[in-house]
């Protein structure tokens, strides 16, 4: 018998959590996309007005809070992909291959320039 990957297990746990609360009726793609944005902005608040060094120096309770915000974004993202029938792992692989073509190492290494400015 094949074993579940960790992503499949997480997807299953998200479905169980949602379905036990009868929330599927609210979890349409538009609402999930909105929720991703809202949660991403809650994450962003933790770094607002911080220097790059300060943003790397999070510890303790602050780090745990940030981890929860990251998890909120991830949960909604995984559920959105699931609802739309998108294989998230394959989509990430495809996007990385696409970006590798747009940003070849010999032109983009050490540069923050956009692909059309390389």
In which residue ranges do the predicted regions lie?
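Flexible "arm" and connector segments at domain edges
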Residues: 1-70, 74-118
